[in-house]
Amino acid sequence: MIKIKLTHPDCMPKIGSEDAAGMDLRAFFGTNPAADLRAIAPGKSLMIDTGVAVEIPRGWFGLVVPRSSLGKRHLMIANTAGVIDSDYRGTIKMNLYNYGSEMQTLENFERLCQLVVLPHYSTHNFKIVDELEETIRGEGGFGSSGSK
């Protein structure tokens, strides 16, 4: 179970369907009506609070990714995704970057990104070795597996 703490009731994440992989996170600019809109100029970024803090079970992590509609507006998460560790208790933030040529206006409580919760392999369970086990792919990197 994931516990969710809200800064404001309207920050409640939205789950789009029964089989949705993530929950939509909203922009939270505060409760002052004068602060209901924010703009991001072309080539600039804006750190946005979601008003949501989570308690993710140990062995899992949250991944903040853009909603597909952000691309239509030429907005992206500045570092492409955000990792929320299970021991983090602060509010989740989204750093959005405007890679377009027009000013983009955001509304208070607008759904912008989504939080997907995934299991992870412990980063404390590793061993330094001199050689790795051989595979058919080997060291083939970008494009090595073909495109068709």
Curated annotation (Swiss-Prot):
E.C. no: 3.6.1.23
Gene3D superfamilies from the entry?
A: 2.70.40.10
Q: What induces it?
A: Expressed in the early phase of the viral replicative cycle.
Tell whether Magnesium is among the UniProt keywords: yes
The chemistry this enzyme catalyses reads:
dUTP + H2O = dUMP + diphosphate + H(+)
User: Would the keyword Ubl conjugation be found if you checked this record's keyword annotation?
Assistant: no
Q: Which keywords accompany this UniProt record?
A: Early protein, Hydrolase, Magnesium, Metal-binding, Nucleotide metabolism
What is the uppermost EC class here? hydrolase
Q: Name one Pfam family in it.
A: dUTPase
- CDD domains assigned: trimeric_dUTPase
Q: What's one GO BP annotation on this UniProt entry?
A: dUTP catabolic process
The disulfides recorded in the entry are: none
Q: What Gene Ontology molecular function terms does this protein carry?
A: dUTP diphosphatase activity; magnesium ion binding
Annotated metabolic or biological route of this protein: Pyrimidine metabolism; dUMP biosynthesis; dUMP from dCTP (dUTP route): step 2/2
What does the record give as cofactor? Mg(2+)
Q: What does this protein do, in the record's words?
A: This enzyme decreases the intracellular concentration of dUTP so that uracil cannot be incorporated into viral progeny DNA. This activity is sufficient to exclude uracil from the DNA during phage replication. In the case of dUTPase mutant phages, the host dUTPase activity is not sufficient to exclude uracil from T5 DNA and uracil are incorporated, leading to decreased phage viability.
Family according to the record? Belongs to the dUTPase family.
Q: Please state what the protein is called.
A: Deoxyuridine 5'-triphosphate nucleotidohydrolase
Organism source for this protein? Escherichia phage T5
What does the record give as the organism's lineage? Answer: Viruses, Duplodnaviria, Heunggongvirae, Uroviricota, Caudoviricetes
